[in-house]
Amino acid sequence: MEIHLFNEIGKVTDGPFMVHVALSTYRFDLGQIDMLFIRSVFLHNKHISCWIRIPFNIRNVDVDLHRYFSFKPKRKNERTIILARPVVFFSLPLLSPGIDNNKLAVEAMCICRFVNTNGAEFFDLEFMYEDILREFPDVGDECIKEDDHVDDFFTLGACSSATVGTVQNSTGQDHRSPVNDNNEHTVTPGPLEPPSVVRGVDSNSGNGLNNMTPGKCNGYPTGKHVWKAIDIYRLQPLHTPSDNVYRVLYDKSSFLKPRISQPPYDGLASCFFLRHEVYRFMRVIGTEIIDKFFDVMNSEDGILFQKFLCHVPMNALDISIPEMVYLSQNVWTSHVDPRSCIIKGVVAHLFKNPRRPCFVGSLTENEYWVDVIDIRQNRIYYGQKIKLAVDQETNLLTCNDKSRRYEQRAGLSVLYINTDLCCIWSFTGGFAVEFRLTLEDIGNVDLIRAVFGAPSTLFE
């Protein structure tokens, strides 16, 4: 995510300070979004603000940031920064409404939700407000001015405004100690003698300032440890001729192989309590689904019945049914995701009342949300919508769309759920187990309502 920002926060007098955003990501198909909402989450009291719809613009072109900002790079050989198409442009208020004295809420998180209403899909981008204005030390830049350079207090060298020792005379004679010379008036008096060993530091090494690398300050990151925040990765600051600064921040998903970064201070990961609560909910409901599955299996003495109308493929025996059950459940539980059919099914159940809109679309009769689990590729196709029918002759389930008869393909397992929380877990050959969830199995219902509830403007 590229957030470019003028550093004129002190000049703001009226209203919120707007941050202009250019977003490109591989995590979500931005070309299909038709609505954008933002909300604030306050970490100190866990208050969640209402969703606010904001305008945006989509361009299906690659964007050169240097041309977009109309300025030249600092160096001739500096590589250009290209945002891959499609790119979404929008602006969001940096200062959240309702904050006293219109000050920045440093303990607040911004959630941007990109919605595809046609596909009932959405993508959340989360970042801390304070991360936008956090001071990033520029690695390799001069952090200490020449006039402010400090020598070791006990090193006898040329005097400056902050050092003591002997003075080099104008004729180029050798340095002489003030103890052996009568030029006391030409030197700044220092201590009578240096200490010996204080707190494990030998006097010969002084206080270590002479060993400092020129141009770097203690306590700042080195070139190998650039500051990073969760989901946001800083590339570099961009300076314009008018001294306006643009902060360039990358969403972690912009990289094909996202970097795994550590938070800059303890507890940052725990600040994202909303996301953690969602994943905790998913782990709970995932465990319930596995338990329900085996409860039915035990009641049937371990027998799997064919519930889908299909032929058993010839290569289905490459993976036995018991192995397929274990592998499919292992793949699904290890890749649990908010896009899962289980989340969509639970949300559709909680918001069945049309007066209570949500970001997940409703289901018609005999429609299911499904997760297609590819065991061989260790991959899941989340939250697809499919409509099942009942064959009149065999009373088995079938799908009129032949391209979506997944049970006829070897190595695939499918998890179904509808708005009544009826679940079906099927395997190659149409063998399946049916079970049902309850509200008691779901757990934190209020969390799901808070996360997936939507403003009424979504359906206007």
Curated annotation (Swiss-Prot):
Stretches the record annotates as Disordered: 167-197
A Pfam family the protein falls into: Herpes_UL17
Biased composition (Basic and acidic residues): 173-184
Transmembrane spans: none
GO biological process: chromosome organization
Keywords recorded for this protein, A-Z: Capsid protein, Host nucleus, Late protein, Viral genome packaging, Viral release from host cell, Virion
GO cellular component, one term: host cell nucleus
Record has Iron as a keyword: no
Location(s), subcellular: Virion; Host nucleus
UniProt keyword Nuclease present: no
Classification via HAMAP family: HSV_CVC1
Family designation: Belongs to the herpesviridae CVC1 protein family.
Cited function: Capsid vertex-specific component that plays a role during viral DNA encapsidation, assuring correct genome cleavage and presumably stabilizing capsids that contain full-length viral genomes.
Subunit annotation: Interacts (via C-terminus) with capsid vertex component 2/CVC2.
The protein's name in its UniProt record: Capsid vertex component 1
